[in-house]
Amino acid sequence: VRLFQRTTRSQSLTDNGALFYERCLRALEEIRGAESQLETGKHQVSGRLRVAMPVLFGRQCIAPLLIELAQEHPGLELEMSFSDRIVDLVEEGFDMAVRNGTLADSAVLVARRLGVHRMVLCAAPDYLIKNGQPQSVDDLRQYTAINYTRAGRVLPWQLMDYDGTSRTFIPRSSLNMDDLQAICDAALAGHGIAWLPCWMVIKEIHQGNLVPLFKQAPDVRFDVHAVWQQTPHLPLRVRIAIDMLVKRLPAVMSLEFPASIKKPR
């Protein structure tokens, strides 16, 4: 039976070849499913787990949890990749990725929400003593902002007024940086107001090094997801990693001063 159609310039599958290829893919899926069931039956997590994640968020929040998981399961070989680009899980061979914000539609990927980022507007106490504390979003125009840039563009702040109205504020400043840690360091040094995720500033806030602003206003949150390639049989090592992150990640990202929860409209 002829499976390939060859010419001097190209090669393609015949109808029989395409049918054979599809059957082979199904057979491989059945084998993977059988392996997954064997793993589940033994309750042993083993094999290599490749996870992609954003650099700072991954380093501070995700990596410590996954390392603990690997220590609990000696048969698990953990490989973590830190990058702020959107990796191609299929082409680059990752088992799963952690992604922040809105996800693009995909026919080949599955997602599960792990938790939410809570964004915090904050500044150093010395800066606020010197310049006063803003009382509303409109007041921010009178203050120095420390901007986050991506691809040369200043990203706007998504804020909430006290009545829950969503506001998009584009800060104007001579301080523009494409690294969140550098922005946090500049805020700690008293150079202005910064809009940062709470997991990055929680310790500094509780130690009194940064002061959260607009605490009584509803806060803005962004979803965090785990994504993986769609498959009828998810390997046990991937499923256990996702379940662990769902259970433990929200506490890592929390901030303990009370506020209502509201998403931007």
Locate each region found by the language model.
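Secondary-structure junction motif
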Residues: 144-163
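A short LG(V/I)-centered, amphipathic sequence patch enriched
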Residues: 1-13
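Short beta-strand-to-loop elements that line the ligand-binding cleft
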Residues: 77-82, 147, 168-179, 217
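Central regulatory/effector-binding core of bacterial HTH transcription factors
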Residues: 47-108, 258-265
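C-terminal effector-binding regulatory domain of bacterial HTH transcription factors
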Residues: 22, 75, 199-203, 207, ...
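Flexible hinge/capping segments at coil-to-helix
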Residues: 107-119, 123-146
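Alpha-helical "hinge/linker" immediately C-terminal to small N-terminal DNA-binding modules
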Residues: 12-40
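A ligand-binding cleft/hinge motif common to bilobed small-molecule-binding domains
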Residues: 184-209
